Amino acid sequence: MSAQIISGNKLAQQIKTQIFEHIASYVQQGYRAPGLAVILVGSDPASQVYVGSKRKTCAELGIYSESYDLPADTTETQLLSLINKLNNDEKIDGILVQLPLPEHVDTTKIIEAISPDKDVDGFHPYNVGRLCQRIPTLRACTPYGVMKLLETTGENLYGKHAVIVGASNIVGRPMALELLLGGCTVTITHRFTKNLENHVRQADLLVVAVGQPNLIPGEWIKENAIVIDVGINRIGGKLVGDVEYEAASQKAKFITPVPGGVGPMTVAMLMQNTLLAYQRHINP
């Protein structure tokens, strides 16, 4: 048996087409275009690639974007001042600060400084708290994208045992909340978890987001499981995920590829959040 591939490229394109049509309709009615401010501190190569992709997508969809490429020695105070300015800028609906930030900057303080209704990354404690209380508004982009991918499988998530490998604030923790909201019984594993293999083997739905190439052997996958691989790792010029893809796809019912799985969805859901924030600003 070979798993059905869950294509993020295909779904992301459909979502972006819908966003483009919505924006075109608003502009045709005389409204301004949505505005997204993208802040990059330093010159981390991976961050530059991600930011470039986000800016390109904005241009394709008709979203007005402002770029702030700041030197690595930018102070926390300077960054907070810029965020405050953007919070009060009427033409900006979303503010994105590309992570990771330099060590001398307190990431938590920066995230908390962004107005919750402009927090299109979905990282602000207010937005995470709303998800926790089952009233989500702006949701963390990667977990939100994963939920959209799961919808395309047609599988009923109610009662499925979902196992998440990785407990980061960006993916693992909000992913657990999304799956809980989706009706799953959720197990979160992390660096202190004992006997990871035992947990993975029980997963009807496995989400792996660690950033270690081929961390999960294919033989650990439960028959007919759904496998969502969030990891993106470069080995010898090739991109691979956190799951041993070939072996896993022989046991799973559905699996996301790397690349072309979760990655494109993260950017698509960022644009979706930007549209949502915009709609709330023009129709409060």
UniProtKB/Swiss-Prot annotation:
Membrane-traversing stretches: none
GO biological process, one term: methionine biosynthetic process
GO cellular component: cytosol
Annotated binding of NADP(+), by residue: G166, A167, S168, I232
Reactions accelerated catalytically: (6R)-5,10-methylene-5,6,7,8-tetrahydrofolate + NADP(+) = (6R)-5,10-methenyltetrahydrofolate + NADPH; (6R)-5,10-methenyltetrahydrofolate + H2O = (6R)-10-formyltetrahydrofolate + H(+)
E.C. code: 1.5.1.5, 3.5.4.9
KW Oxidoreductase (keyword) present: yes
One example GO MF annotation: methylenetetrahydrofolate dehydrogenase (NADP+) activity
Record InterPro entries: Aminoacid_DH-like_N_sf (IPR046346), NAD(P)-bd_dom_sf (IPR036291), THF_DH/CycHdrlase (IPR000672), THF_DH/CycHdrlase_cat_dom (IPR020630), THF_DH/CycHdrlase_CS (IPR020867), THF_DH/CycHdrlase_NAD-bd_dom (IPR020631)
Pathway annotation: One-carbon metabolism; tetrahydrofolate interconversion
Pfam families in UniProt: THF_DHG_CYH, THF_DHG_CYH_C
Function: Catalyzes the oxidation of 5,10-methylenetetrahydrofolate to 5,10-methenyltetrahydrofolate and then the hydrolysis of 5,10-methenyltetrahydrofolate to 10-formyltetrahydrofolate.
Oligomeric and partner information: Homodimer.
Protein's name according to its UniProt entry: Bifunctional protein FolD
Gene name per UniProt: folD
